[in-house]
From Swiss-Prot:
Can catalyze the hydrolysis of ATP in the presence of single-stranded DNA, the ATP-dependent uptake of single-stranded DNA by duplex DNA, and the ATP-dependent hybridization of homologous single-stranded DNAs. It interacts with LexA causing its activation and leading to its autocatalytic cleavage. HAMAP family: RecA (MF_00268). This is Protein RecA. GO terms for molecular function: ATP binding; ATP hydrolysis activity; ATP-dependent DNA damage sensor activity; damaged DNA binding; endonuclease activity; single-stranded DNA binding. ATP binds at G67, P68, E69, S70, S71, G72, K73, T74. The keyword ATP-binding applies. InterPro entries: AAA+_ATPase (IPR003593), DNA_recomb/repair_RecA (IPR013765), DNA_recomb/repair_RecA_CS (IPR020584), Hint_dom_C (IPR003586), Hint_dom_N (IPR003587), Hint_dom_sf (IPR036844), Homing_endonucl (IPR027434), Intein_C (IPR030934). Belongs to the RecA family. GO terms for biological process: DNA recombination; DNA repair; intein-mediated protein splicing; SOS response. The keyword Nucleus does not apply. It is found in: Cytoplasm. Its main location: cytoplasm. It comes from Mycobacterium leprae (strain TN). It comes from the Bacteria.
């Protein structure tokens, strides 16, 4: 402890030397100065401001806006320019694409007379101009449109066909290293607009000729045959927006020449011979539960995502949940096939009738019924891949069943009824009590000995907190089995809740007044194709074959397909300019056009979705939707209506929109026009939304001191 003063003194000497060498403020304690809230530039869409978490684009940071062509990237950037200018800011636009339309910018609110515009000839020139403007300290926002158009000088001066691998990426990396500090010091926001391109074929993995692609009708075809014949086929593909397996058209075919080697994969599946097989180059991307992974990084025992039929309806899944809490179990498939077996158990004639009732609810699932020498009846259902994750979550290896909080949230009256019918007992009160109690009384006990200790407590608390039941946990008998004991009042309340779901053969477990209410009828659904995890059984280097060429296809829209049921990527989307911009950007926004807005048959705009894929100033991964009207840009009023309805400030009744008793109009277009004509109402709604959500940093308060700057 005697060394502490010496350490403090040494630190003070070091800080003094640093300030002497590099200037005052070059190092300081974070608490020495009052922290300023983050200053922002509004985007023009309240929904996007909310998704960004701070009310707009942060000042002094790099922002990347990327997306497909005609998705609205430049429109979003120009609205930020207009909002910066509206409060007296200075804006610059580096038009590397030479495509800025002044009239359109003016309609969005941009002061084109004072806008600084540069149309550079090379990427180096564009970035040097941007750097010099930023270092002037007079700029509030600069837009570079676009990164893809920042062509290095060497490439422009070279010959057609010359290769310049990584040249633009190195240029961007160097420029961003120089710009980052200057942006922070000057408080300038730099918006980089970026394009999407696809990584196809030779650099990013391919398939062996014999690998079979899953077609839209469920059949398969060799990828080599599809490519060589340029077959016009539709394949199964996963749509992440709708979370569904959908047919998609093959729009391009690639034969990328010979490969050094292929990896042969064997993956478990439920049907056919129980195995999916395919051969891919080590760098081909395969979908796993944790995301995309290169084939060369996978080993036996890892899990990938595969398409399997889903058979269970919501009602049937509830039957499984209730049975798992009681006498049912899920057993792993021991034949190296995907899926787990759901087994039901019953004893005696009453239980057999109850077992038949359960079997009827699962009637569309293939099963076998058997009886052992002791008279116990069993029903074994065919292995179901959709129950694999449930089995992994419930059986953790200690022999007891583990029910998580998420499991308990899924409990319905039907689930509780099946659990009670499986493991519950009902004791009728004494004759004297029966005489005093209309309809009789009794107590329920439900055995929970097969569950973990933590699960027993969670289940008791769930019944108490969610259903208001007086339930105690105790041990009974010489074996000390754990049971949940219901009070008389809780028994009546619980039986009232589950009575409509009790099987006729189990009504003896109910009070007389609750009998005869059962009305459960089987509910079946058509099988659907869904993604489920599947275990990799084997990976090895495939022996050389006659054809060692690499084949790939490009799929419309989703950029993924299935090989013998396993999900693989065909052409990952990426942004231009290397990875430096991903690293240096504080905010990255993925802009997509999701719908065309029409007035009759005429297109009048687009519905746009923006995903915040990176955010270092607020929680990321939020998304916003708003309208972009042709010739007008982002519809601020439309966004206010959407957010107003969502936050409860604007009331929607049928097609009418109302704000504080005042009708805004019938239909969104009329309500939009009302707010356009009544700016004070629009501003009031915006203010209330921002106050409720706590966004929009205030930077003009008297108690906030400006950061001192030494020149």
């Amino acid at each position: 402890m005697a060394q502490v003063p010496d350490r403090e003194k040494a630190l003070e000497l070091a800080m003094a030397q640093i300030e002497k060498n590099y200037g005052k403020g070059s190092v300081m304690r974070l608490g020495d100065e009052m922290c300023q809230p983050i200053s922002v530039i509004p985007t023009g869409s309240i929904a996007l401001d909310v998704a960004l978490g701070i009310g707009g684009l942060p000042r002094g940071r790099i922002v990347e806006i990327y997306g497909p062509e005609s998705s609205g990237k430049t429109t979003v950037a120009l609205h930020a320019v207009a909002n910066a200018q509206a409060v007296g800011g200075v804006a610059a636009f580096i038009d590397a694409e030479h495509a800025l339309e002044p009239e359109y910018a003016k309609k969005l609110g941009v002061d084109t007379d004072s806008l600084l515009v540069s149309q550079p000839d090379t990427g180096e020139q564009a970035l040097e101009i941007a750097d010099m403007l930023i270092r002037s300290g007079a700029l509030d926002i600069v837009v570079i449109d676009s990164v893809a158009a920042l062509v290095p000088r060497a490439e422009l001066e070279g010959e057609m066909g010359d290769s310049y691998v990584g040249l633009q990426a190195r240029l961007m990396s160097q420029a961003l290293r120089k710009m980052t500090g200057a942006l922070s010091n000057s408080g300038t926001t730099a918006i980089f607009i970026n394009q999407l391109r696809e990584k196809i074929g030779v650099m990013f993995g391919c398939m062996n000729y014999s690998t079979r692609v899953t077609l839209a009708d469920g059949s398969t075809e060799k990828i080599g045959k599809i490519v060589n014949n340029k077959m016009d086929v539709r394949v199964l593909s996963y749509d992440p927006v709708t979370d569904r397996i959908v047919p998609r058209k093959v729009v391009n075919w690639f034969n990328n020449g010979p490969a050094e080697q292929f990896l042969q994969f064997t993956v478990e599946k439920s049907g056919s011979n129980g195995k999916s097989q395919f051969a891919a180059t080590p760098n081909h991307l395969i979908r796993t539960p944790g995301g995309w992974t290169e084939a060369g990084n996978l080993i036996a025992g890892d899990r990938v995502l595969a398409v399997e039929p889903h058979m269970l309806s919501d009602q049937q899944f509830q039957v499984v949940l209730g049975s798992l809490m009681g006498d049912g179990n899920l057993s792993p498939n021991l034949c190296d096939r995907n899926g787990v077996r759901f087994r039901l158990l019953g004893y005696g004639c009453k239980q057999v009738e109850y077992l038949q009732w359960k079997k009827a609810l699962m009637g569309n699932i293939r099963h076998t019924v058997r009886e052992n020498s002791m008279g116990a009846s069993f029903i074994d259902f065919t292995p179901l891949p959709e129950l694999v994750e449930l089995q992994r979550a419930v059986y953790l290896g200690d022999g007891k069943k583990f029910l998580s909080e998420e499991y308990l949230k899924a409990l319905t009256p039907l689930v509780l009824a099946i659990w009670y019918m499986d493991d519950g007992s009902f004791t009728v009160g004494s004759k004297r009590v029966q005489e005093r109690t209309a309809g009789g009384s009794g107590r329920i006990e439900i055995c929970v000995d097969a569950m973990t200790e933590g699960t027993r407590v969670r289940l008791r608390d769930y019944l108490c907190d969610t259903h208001g039941l007086d339930v105690r946990l105790r041990e009974v008998g010489s074996a000390g089995k754990a049971v949940l004991v219901f009070s008389t009042a809780a028994t009546a309340k619980f039986q009232s809740l589950i009575a409509p779901y009790v099987a006729p053969s189990m009504e003896y477990k109910l009070l007389p007044q609750f009998r005869g209410r059962g009305s459960v009828t089987p509910q079946f659904v058509e099988p659907t194709q869904q993604l489920v995890p599947a275990r990799v059984l084997d990976v090895h280097v495939k022996l050389s074959t006659r054809s060692m060429n690499r084949f790939d296809i490009e799929v419309e829209g989703n950029h993924n397909y299935f090989v013998d049921g396993v999900m693989v990527h065909n052409s990952p989307e990426t942004t231009t300019g290397g990875k430096a911009l991903k690293f240096y950007a504080s905010v990255r926004m993925d802009v997509r056009r999701i719908e065309t807005l029409k007035d009759g048959v005429d297109a009048v705009g687009n519905r746009t979705r923006v995903k915040i894929v990176k955010n270092k100033v607020s929680p990321p991964f939020k998304q916003a939707e708003f309208d972009i009207l042709y010739g007008k840009g982002i519809s601020r009023e439309g966004s206010l209506i959407d957010m107003g309805v969502e936050q409860g400030f604007v009331r929607k009744s049928g097609s009418w929109f109302t704000y504080e008793g005042e009708q805004l109009g019938q239909g969104k277009e009329n309500a939009r026009n009302f707010l356009l004509e009544n700016a004070d109402v629009a501003n009031e709604i915006e203010k209330k939304i921002k106050e409720k959500l706590g966004i929009g940093a205030v930077v003009t308060d008297d108690d906030i001191l400006p950061t001192p700057v030494d020149f």
